[in-house]
UniProtKB/Swiss-Prot annotation:
This is Phospholipase A2 group V. InterPro entries: PLipase_A2, PLipase_A2_Asp_AS, PLipase_A2_dom, PLipase_A2_dom_sf, PLipase_A2_His_AS. It comes from Homo sapiens (Human). The active site is at H67, D111. Gene3D superfamilies: Phospholipase A2 domain.
């Protein structure tokens, strides 16, 4: 057990940090879920992708609903969710947000919660909602 701490420290320090932001959410989704972010989640249900309205269609869509609300809370606090950058590490299936200013850390935390939620809901992912027309959301 004693030897694991130095090993863990070495590995944590040797994994390169990845630049974040809205564009890198794609990378985080793909690393954690193994799915193409744009084609699988860019237009999924009523909340995945831009905007959102109505009742989420399933667990995956609820993940996006929660993510939208997480982003909304950050915008209320003055964070620019579309261009704000942050750093995170990804190793052995684990996303770790790097320390930094409030907006950076919390934006990363919103994205981290989303990708783990999407991963938990992979089994219930429904291709029927992959390109769901928002007009049907109420």
């Amino acid at each position: 057990m004693k030897g694991l701490l130095p090993l863990a420290w070495f590995l944590a320090c040797s994994v390169p940090a990845v630049q974040g932001g809205l564009l890198d959410l794609k990378s985080m989704i793909e690393k954690v879920t193994g799915k193409n972010a744009l084609t699988n989640y860019g237009f999924y249900g009523c909340y995945c992708g831009w905007g959102g309205r109505g009742t989420p269609k399933d667990g995956t869509d609820w993940c996006c609903w929660a993510h939208d609300h997480c982003y909304g809370r950050l915008e209320e606090k003055g964070c620019n969710i579309r261009t704000q950058s942050y750093k995170y590490r990804f190793a052995w299936g684990v996303v770790t947000c790097e320390p930094g200013p409030f907006c950076h850390v919390n934006l990363c935390a919103c994205d981290r919660k989303l990708v783990y939620c999407l991963k938990r809901n992979l089994r219930s992912y429904n291709p029927q909602y992959q390109y769901f027309p928002n007009i049907l959301c109420s």
